[in-house]
Amino acid sequence: MSAAAGAAQAAEHHDMLHMVEMDLNFWNIPLFTEYDKYWHIMGLSISPRTMIMTWITMALVLLFAWACTKNQNVRSPGKAQATFEVLWEFLGGQVFSNLGNKLGAAMMPIIVTFFIYIVFANLLGLIPTLSSPTADKNTTFGLALIVVLLIHYHGLKANGVGGHIGHYFQPFKPFVVIHLIEEIARPVTLAFRLYGNIFAGEVLIAVLLGLININAYVFGGFIPSVIWLAFSVFVGFVQAFVFSMLTIAYVSQFAAHEADHH
């Protein structure tokens, strides 16, 4: 396939998905269907769609946190509090077993926040005409950059400058090349893994919902859409868990000696 033919096919698919989004736009908000609209601020191109979805996600996270803590009761916790306690204990088992008590206590709030934010961000795209912030690679690269900063911060704190730099020369000095390649690949793979799974899920959901819209009848569009929506909910949780666990593993790799003292 030539480059021109590939571009034409991509444009055709884009137009089809755009048409589906327009037909499903029961919010009647033009901004939610303008894929190509950007804000240009100080030389930067900013997607208002992604920004608004990010604000909505943050609001949902804050609302969830408020619901979990508004009526704290040790003896008879509410449903939101009980859900959060189960989540905290589950993730806490992973954090403290890999990072130890001291580093685990420092990382625990960050890991839980990562998980909750990514879950809400992933699931937001399952609502027709809305989109997941994590379906934008700029968001996932931003999250990956935070992980990289955490890795080096805790690595320097645990091992000092000399020990942290010396990590790149282990077990032999020539391995520094491999470690540097790994350093570049780590945030790239972390970002694209999350972005690719969520973006692909959104595209397929739009296609399946489009089948309903073009009179494919109940068994032609509705049932596959419901099945894929259920699977997408599962994928949304799994990808949040994978991102959180990889963050734990990467921090543990650079601050390993703290994990030995739990």
Swiss-Prot record:
CDD domains: ATP-synt_Fo_a_6. The chain crosses the membrane at residues 50-70, 107-127, 141-161, 194-214, 218-238, 239-259. It comes from the Bacteria. The keyword Cell membrane applies. Keywords: ATP synthesis, Cell membrane, CF(0), Hydrogen ion transport, Ion transport, Membrane, Transmembrane, Transmembrane helix, Transport. GO terms for biological process: proton motive force-driven plasma membrane ATP synthesis. One of its GO terms (cellular component) is proton-transporting ATP synthase complex. One of its GO terms (molecular function) is proton-transporting ATP synthase activity, rotational mechanism. SUPFAM superfamilies: F1F0 ATP synthase subunit A. It is found in: Cell membrane. Its main location: membrane. It is a multi-pass membrane protein. The keyword Cytoplasm does not apply. F-type ATPases have 2 components, CF(1) - the catalytic core - and CF(0) - the membrane proton channel. CF(1) has five subunits: alpha(3), beta(3), gamma(1), delta(1), epsilon(1). CF(0) has three main subunits: a(1), b(2) and c(9-12). The alpha and beta chains form an alternating ring which encloses part of the gamma chain. CF(1) is attached to CF(0) by a central stalk formed by the gamma and epsilon chains, while a peripheral stalk is formed by the delta and b chains. Key component of the proton channel; it plays a direct role in the translocation of protons across the membrane. Belongs to the ATPase A chain family. This is ATP synthase subunit a. The lineage of its organism: Bacteria, Bacillati, Bacillota, Clostridia, Eubacteriales.
